Amino acid sequence: MDTLNTYVGSFIFMAYSGYYKPIHPQKYRGNPTNIVYRSLWERKFMVFCDNNPSILQWGSEEIIIPYRAPDGKIRRYYPDFYIKVREKSGKVTKYIIEVKPKKQTQPPNVKNKKTAKYRNEALTYAKNQTKWSAAREYCEDRQMNFLILTEDHLGV
């Protein structure tokens, strides 16, 4: 993870989506002609993965993790990224990474409990926690690491 922390310092978040065309398509796990980003943070992370020589392989929404949603239904979670990194020590480590605004990683403010905004934030938080719990389990079973990157990690 040393490598990842070294290079992600200059990201900006904006609501933005499109298709990313990799410079190094051989590094991409999946179809390199159909790489979708759903935010500018994701796009910049794609550029980082594509151009960083320590990242041996990467993918975006290429892994499917089944989970039981708060409504009891079985659903599928597509984490934002999979990366395989050669650490400075030479060790190869695999990560599943979710890129999210910090606000969505924390419980909503209880002071506003009666508002629609609170209910929406509480539902988003509960859904995210359920998905991320399934992702941690998935990673643990496969000797991988699960990370959530927020604006704090991305230097925004």
Residue map of PLM features:
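Electrostatic, structured charged patches in enzyme active sites and in nucleic-acid/phosphate-binding
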Residues: 2-156
